[in-house]
Protein backbone atom coordinates (compact mmCIF):
# COMPACT_ATOMS: atom_id res chain seq x y z
CA UNK A 1 0.00 0.00 0.00
CA UNK A 2 2.85 2.38 0.81
CA UNK A 3 4.35 1.84 -2.67
CA UNK A 4 0.97 2.44 -4.28
CA UNK A 5 0.40 5.59 -2.23
CA UNK A 6 3.86 6.90 -3.13
CA UNK A 7 3.21 6.19 -6.82
CA UNK A 8 -0.17 7.92 -6.69
CA UNK A 9 1.28 10.95 -4.94
CA UNK A 10 4.11 11.17 -7.46
CA UNK A 11 1.74 10.93 -10.40
CA UNK A 12 -0.57 13.53 -8.91
CA UNK A 13 2.32 15.88 -8.28
CA UNK A 14 3.46 15.46 -11.90
CA UNK A 15 0.04 16.32 -13.30
CA UNK A 16 -0.26 19.27 -10.93
CA UNK A 17 3.11 20.63 -12.03
CA UNK A 18 2.17 20.21 -15.71
CA UNK A 19 -1.15 22.06 -15.41
CA UNK A 20 0.39 24.76 -13.21
CA UNK A 21 3.05 25.40 -15.86
CA UNK A 22 0.43 25.41 -18.64
CA UNK A 23 -1.76 27.93 -16.81
CA UNK A 24 1.22 30.04 -15.78
CA UNK A 25 2.65 30.40 -19.29
CA UNK A 26 0.14 29.62 -22.09
CA UNK A 27 2.70 30.70 -24.72
CA UNK A 28 4.66 27.53 -24.02
CA UNK A 29 1.77 25.31 -25.12
CA UNK A 30 3.02 23.25 -28.07
CA UNK A 31 0.59 22.48 -30.89
CA UNK A 32 1.11 19.40 -33.06
CA UNK A 33 1.58 21.51 -36.18
CA UNK A 34 2.26 25.10 -37.24
CA UNK A 35 -1.32 25.44 -38.38
CA UNK A 36 -4.31 24.77 -36.17
CA UNK A 37 -8.03 25.37 -36.20
CA UNK A 38 -7.67 28.53 -34.12
CA UNK A 39 -5.29 30.22 -36.55
CA UNK A 40 -6.86 32.75 -38.91
CA UNK A 41 -6.04 32.63 -42.62
CA UNK A 42 -3.76 35.46 -43.64
CA UNK A 43 -5.31 37.98 -46.02
CA UNK A 44 -2.44 37.51 -48.48
CA UNK A 45 -3.15 33.76 -48.60
CA UNK A 46 -6.67 34.19 -49.98
CA UNK A 47 -6.92 33.47 -53.71
CA UNK A 48 -8.34 36.13 -56.02
CA UNK A 49 -10.19 34.12 -58.66
CA UNK A 50 -10.62 37.20 -60.85
CA UNK A 51 -6.95 38.21 -60.85
CA UNK A 52 -6.90 38.46 -64.66
CA UNK A 53 -10.31 40.18 -64.85
CA UNK A 54 -11.59 37.34 -67.03
CA UNK A 55 -13.88 35.58 -64.62
CA UNK A 56 -17.14 35.02 -66.54
CA UNK A 57 -19.11 36.86 -63.85
CA UNK A 58 -17.04 39.99 -64.42
CA UNK A 59 -17.46 39.79 -68.21
CA UNK A 60 -21.19 39.06 -68.36
CA UNK A 61 -23.58 42.01 -68.45
CA UNK A 62 -25.29 42.22 -65.02
CA UNK A 63 -28.96 41.31 -64.72
CA UNK A 64 -31.36 44.26 -64.80
CA UNK A 65 -34.24 42.37 -63.17
CA UNK A 66 -35.29 38.90 -61.96
CA UNK A 67 -37.46 38.01 -64.95
CA UNK A 68 -36.81 34.58 -66.53
CA UNK A 69 -35.90 36.16 -69.86
CA UNK A 70 -33.21 38.31 -68.22
CA UNK A 71 -31.89 35.33 -66.23
CA UNK A 72 -31.61 33.30 -69.43
CA UNK A 73 -29.74 36.13 -71.11
CA UNK A 74 -27.34 36.42 -68.16
CA UNK A 75 -26.69 32.66 -68.06
CA UNK A 76 -25.99 32.69 -71.80
CA UNK A 77 -23.49 35.52 -71.27
CA UNK A 78 -21.76 33.51 -68.55
CA UNK A 79 -21.50 30.43 -70.75
CA UNK A 80 -20.17 32.48 -73.66
CA UNK A 81 -17.27 33.75 -71.53
CA UNK A 82 -16.20 30.46 -69.92
CA UNK A 83 -12.67 29.24 -70.68
CA UNK A 84 -12.47 25.56 -71.56
CA UNK A 85 -8.75 24.80 -71.86
CA UNK A 86 -5.50 25.49 -70.06
CA UNK A 87 -2.64 27.80 -70.98
CA UNK A 88 0.90 26.56 -70.36
CA UNK A 89 3.51 29.31 -70.15
CA UNK A 90 7.12 28.14 -70.24
CA UNK A 91 9.66 30.78 -69.21
CA UNK A 92 13.34 30.44 -70.17
CA UNK A 93 16.06 32.58 -68.69
CA UNK A 94 18.77 33.57 -71.20
CA UNK A 95 22.17 31.86 -71.11
CA UNK A 96 25.28 33.22 -69.43
CA UNK A 97 26.48 36.48 -70.99
CA UNK A 98 29.24 39.07 -70.61
CA UNK A 99 28.27 42.46 -69.20
CA UNK A 100 30.87 44.44 -71.14
CA UNK A 101 30.41 47.82 -72.80
CA UNK A 102 27.87 50.53 -72.18
CA UNK A 103 25.02 49.25 -74.36
CA UNK A 104 22.97 46.09 -74.72
CA UNK A 105 24.44 45.46 -78.19
CA UNK A 106 27.72 44.32 -76.59
CA UNK A 107 26.12 41.92 -74.09
CA UNK A 108 26.55 38.67 -76.01
CA UNK A 109 26.32 35.12 -74.72
CA UNK A 110 29.52 33.46 -73.62
CA UNK A 111 30.54 30.14 -75.13
CA UNK A 112 29.13 28.48 -72.04
CA UNK A 113 25.93 30.50 -72.35
CA UNK A 114 25.46 29.27 -75.90
CA UNK A 115 26.05 25.70 -74.72
CA UNK A 116 23.49 26.16 -71.94
CA UNK A 117 20.91 27.37 -74.45
CA UNK A 118 21.58 24.34 -76.64
CA UNK A 119 20.99 21.99 -73.70
CA UNK A 120 17.72 23.80 -72.97
CA UNK A 121 16.62 23.54 -76.58
CA UNK A 122 17.30 19.81 -76.58
CA UNK A 123 15.36 19.41 -73.35
CA UNK A 124 12.36 21.27 -74.79
CA UNK A 125 12.57 19.07 -77.88
CA UNK A 126 12.53 15.95 -75.69
CA UNK A 127 9.36 17.18 -73.99
CA UNK A 128 7.63 16.92 -77.38
CA UNK A 129 5.65 20.13 -77.01
CA UNK A 130 3.81 21.60 -79.98
CA UNK A 131 4.35 25.31 -79.51
CA UNK A 132 1.62 27.84 -80.26
CA UNK A 133 3.74 30.94 -79.67
CA UNK A 134 7.39 31.80 -79.09
CA UNK A 135 8.19 35.24 -77.71
CA UNK A 136 11.58 36.67 -76.74
CA UNK A 137 12.79 39.82 -75.05
CA UNK A 138 14.42 42.10 -77.60
CA UNK A 139 17.66 42.28 -75.60
CA UNK A 140 20.66 40.68 -77.33
CA UNK A 141 21.27 37.88 -74.81
CA UNK A 142 17.62 36.78 -74.96
CA UNK A 143 17.53 36.95 -78.76
CA UNK A 144 20.69 34.83 -79.03
CA UNK A 145 19.30 32.31 -76.54
CA UNK A 146 16.02 32.07 -78.45
CA UNK A 147 17.84 31.58 -81.75
CA UNK A 148 19.82 28.63 -80.37
CA UNK A 149 16.71 27.06 -78.82
CA UNK A 150 14.78 27.44 -82.09
CA UNK A 151 17.41 25.30 -83.82
CA UNK A 152 16.37 22.43 -81.54
CA UNK A 153 12.57 22.69 -81.38
CA UNK A 154 9.83 22.39 -83.99
CA UNK A 155 8.68 25.97 -84.59
CA UNK A 156 8.68 28.30 -87.57
CA UNK A 157 11.36 30.93 -86.88
CA UNK A 158 9.49 33.52 -88.94
CA UNK A 159 6.66 33.45 -86.39
CA UNK A 160 8.82 34.35 -83.38
CA UNK A 161 7.80 37.62 -81.74
CA UNK A 162 10.12 40.10 -80.01
CA UNK A 163 8.79 42.09 -77.08
CA UNK A 164 10.38 45.14 -75.46
CA UNK A 165 8.11 44.75 -72.42
CA UNK A 166 10.12 41.65 -71.47
CA UNK A 167 13.43 43.50 -71.17
CA UNK A 168 15.36 43.05 -67.92
CA UNK A 169 14.78 45.60 -65.19
CA UNK A 170 13.89 46.36 -61.58
CA UNK A 171 10.27 45.21 -61.09
CA UNK A 172 9.59 46.28 -57.49
CA UNK A 173 11.71 47.11 -54.41
CA UNK A 174 12.52 43.72 -52.86
CA UNK A 175 11.87 42.60 -49.31
CA UNK A 176 14.15 42.16 -47.51
CA UNK A 177 16.32 44.85 -49.11
CA UNK A 178 19.83 43.88 -50.22
CA UNK A 179 22.96 45.97 -49.99
CA UNK A 180 24.63 44.93 -53.24
CA UNK A 181 21.78 46.00 -55.55
CA UNK A 182 20.03 49.34 -55.06
CA UNK A 183 18.45 50.81 -58.19
CA UNK A 184 17.17 54.37 -58.10
CA UNK A 185 13.51 54.86 -57.24
CA UNK A 186 12.96 56.19 -60.76
CA UNK A 187 14.15 52.87 -62.21
CA UNK A 188 11.61 50.90 -60.18
CA UNK A 189 8.93 53.38 -61.28
CA UNK A 190 9.86 53.02 -64.94
CA UNK A 191 10.68 49.30 -65.11
CA UNK A 192 7.96 48.22 -62.70
CA UNK A 193 5.15 49.59 -64.86
CA UNK A 194 6.60 47.97 -67.98
CA UNK A 195 7.16 44.55 -66.37
CA UNK A 196 3.69 44.59 -64.82
CA UNK A 197 2.28 45.42 -68.26
CA UNK A 198 4.16 42.40 -69.65
CA UNK A 199 2.61 40.20 -66.96
CA UNK A 200 -0.89 41.37 -67.84
CA UNK A 201 -0.22 40.88 -71.54
CA UNK A 202 0.91 37.26 -71.27
CA UNK A 203 -0.69 35.91 -68.08
CA UNK A 204 -4.41 35.29 -68.25
CA UNK A 205 -6.75 32.35 -68.65
CA UNK A 206 -7.55 31.06 -72.14
CA UNK A 207 -10.02 32.90 -74.34
CA UNK A 208 -13.41 31.17 -74.59
CA UNK A 209 -12.82 30.26 -78.26
CA UNK A 210 -9.54 28.43 -77.54
CA UNK A 211 -10.09 24.85 -78.73
CA UNK A 212 -7.20 23.03 -77.01
CA UNK A 213 -4.51 23.50 -74.39
CA UNK A 214 -1.95 26.05 -75.58
CA UNK A 215 1.82 26.26 -75.05
CA UNK A 216 3.65 29.59 -75.06
CA UNK A 217 7.44 29.80 -74.84
CA UNK A 218 8.89 33.05 -73.46
CA UNK A 219 12.64 33.71 -73.43
CA UNK A 220 13.47 36.43 -70.96
CA UNK A 221 15.39 37.48 -67.89
CA UNK A 222 15.90 36.48 -64.27
CA UNK A 223 14.27 39.44 -62.53
CA UNK A 224 11.27 39.42 -64.85
CA UNK A 225 10.71 35.67 -64.54
CA UNK A 226 10.91 35.75 -60.75
CA UNK A 227 8.45 38.63 -60.61
CA UNK A 228 6.09 36.76 -62.96
CA UNK A 229 6.20 33.69 -60.70
CA UNK A 230 5.26 35.71 -57.61
CA UNK A 231 2.48 37.56 -59.41
CA UNK A 232 1.03 34.45 -61.05
CA UNK A 233 0.95 32.46 -57.79
CA UNK A 234 -0.32 35.52 -55.90
CA UNK A 235 2.65 35.52 -53.57
CA UNK A 236 3.81 38.94 -52.30
CA UNK A 237 5.58 40.40 -55.34
CA UNK A 238 8.18 42.03 -53.09
CA UNK A 239 9.59 38.56 -52.41
CA UNK A 240 10.84 38.02 -55.97
CA UNK A 241 14.52 38.42 -55.04
CA UNK A 242 14.31 35.50 -52.58
CA UNK A 243 14.10 33.19 -55.59
CA UNK A 244 17.22 32.23 -57.53
CA UNK A 245 17.16 30.65 -61.00
CA UNK A 246 20.04 29.50 -63.18
CA UNK A 247 20.89 30.64 -66.68
CA UNK A 248 18.91 28.81 -69.39
CA UNK A 249 16.56 27.39 -66.75
CA UNK A 250 12.98 26.28 -67.41
CA UNK A 251 10.06 27.61 -65.38
CA UNK A 252 6.63 26.20 -66.26
CA UNK A 253 3.36 27.76 -65.12
CA UNK A 254 -0.13 26.51 -65.96
CA UNK A 255 -3.28 28.63 -65.93
CA UNK A 256 -6.38 26.44 -65.71
CA UNK A 257 -9.77 27.37 -67.22
CA UNK A 258 -10.97 28.35 -63.74
CA UNK A 259 -8.13 30.85 -63.40
CA UNK A 260 -6.22 28.77 -60.86
CA UNK A 261 -2.45 28.81 -61.40
CA UNK A 262 0.05 26.06 -60.63
CA UNK A 263 3.80 25.73 -61.13
CA UNK A 264 5.31 22.60 -62.66
CA UNK A 265 8.98 23.61 -62.91
CA UNK A 266 10.81 26.44 -61.16
CA UNK A 267 14.27 27.19 -62.54
CA UNK A 268 14.82 23.61 -63.73
CA UNK A 269 18.35 22.96 -65.03
CA UNK A 270 18.69 19.28 -64.17
CA UNK A 271 19.36 18.55 -67.84
CA UNK A 272 22.51 20.73 -67.91
CA UNK A 273 25.78 19.16 -66.69
CA UNK A 274 26.77 20.55 -63.28
CA UNK A 275 30.03 22.02 -64.58
CA UNK A 276 28.06 24.30 -66.91
CA UNK A 277 25.57 25.63 -64.33
CA UNK A 278 25.72 29.38 -63.66
CA UNK A 279 23.43 32.11 -62.41
CA UNK A 280 25.65 35.21 -62.31
CA UNK A 281 27.66 37.26 -64.77
CA UNK A 282 31.19 35.77 -65.01
CA UNK A 283 34.11 37.77 -63.65
CA UNK A 284 36.42 36.87 -66.50
CA UNK A 285 35.80 38.12 -70.01
CA UNK A 286 37.72 35.24 -71.62
CA UNK A 287 38.07 31.48 -71.27
CA UNK A 288 34.59 31.07 -69.80
CA UNK A 289 34.34 27.47 -70.94
Swiss-Prot record:
SMART domains, per database record: PGAM (SM00855)
InterPro entries, alphabetized: His_Pase_superF_clade-1, His_PPase_superfam, Mito_Ser/Thr_phosphatase
CC per GO annotation: mitochondrial outer membrane
EC code: 3.1.3.16
Broad class of the protein's primary localization: mitochondrion
Coiled-coil regions, chain positions: none
Molecular-function GO terms, alphabetical: phosphoprotein phosphatase activity; protein serine/threonine phosphatase activity
Compartment annotation: Mitochondrion outer membrane
Key words of the record: Hydrolase, Membrane, Mitochondrion, Mitochondrion outer membrane
Binding partners and assembly: Interacts with Pk92B/ASK1.
Purpose of the protein: Displays phosphatase activity for serine/threonine residues, and dephosphorylates and activates Pk92B kinase. Has apparently no phosphoglycerate mutase activity.
Family: Belongs to the phosphoglycerate mutase family. BPG-dependent PGAM subfamily.
Protein name: Serine/threonine-protein phosphatase Pgam5, mitochondrial
Species classification: Eukaryota, Metazoa, Ecdysozoa, Arthropoda, Hexapoda
Underlying gene: Pgam5
